[in-house]
Amino acid sequence: MAKFDHFNLLGPFYDWIFSLRNSSKLVKMVDLFPQQALLDIGGGTGRVSENFSGISSSIFVADPAIKMLREAHKKGLMVIIANSEALPFRPASFERVIMIDAFHHVAQHQLTLDEIWRVLKPGGRLVIEEPNIRNIFGKLIAIGEKILLMRSKIIAPEEIISMCAFQDVENIRFVIKSALVWVMIDKRA
């Protein structure tokens, strides 16, 4: 069955409909420094990335939805049309990679993590924020996205961590706060 292109339809209105929660907590988790490059995968309109624009001038938003990226471009962010399973960057290109409320939308979770790990520099950090599938709100999101025919599969943080069995993982942890989960993975320097 063909999937409806929700994100290109929502592009011009997305920021108005969905506000960013916990931006100060996220900025602290990511721990971006001025000379570091940040990649926001599935970053759409740049609503998350713009919180880092005062810290670093090397911020890229990668997303397959062109209309979402147009909104990010209006914010002065560097944009690239890309799927998470085939990132058009050289190995070890970014000190920080974030994927906020997007991991459950990808078609191939393991391939996405493999690609992220490939473009993440040694000493870099990956931060994934997802709905907490064990919370009633996370379950409602999963049901709602299924009803809307979205290609979504919300994964528990332990399963995401088990997919990150890379040789050069230095530190891996997750934080659960009611409806949200953050998975943070540091790559050995």
Where are these regions (language model features)?
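C-terminal lobe and adjacent flexible extensions of AdoMet/dcAdoMet transferase-like proteins
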Residues: 184-189
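A conserved beta-strand element that flanks and buttresses the S-adenosyl-L-methionine
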Residues: 98
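Conserved class I S-adenosyl-L-methionine
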Residues: 1-33, 47-48, 141-142
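Short catalytic micro-motifs in class I SAM-dependent methyltransferases
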Residues: 101-102
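A short glycine-rich, Lys/Arg-flanked "PGG" loop and its adjoining helix->strand segment in the class I
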Residues: 110-122
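Class I SAM-dependent methyltransferase SAM/SAH-binding core
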Residues: 39-86
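C-terminal alpha-helical "lid/dimerization" subdomain adjacent to the S-adenosyl-L-methionine
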Residues: 11, 17-18, 48, 127-167, ...
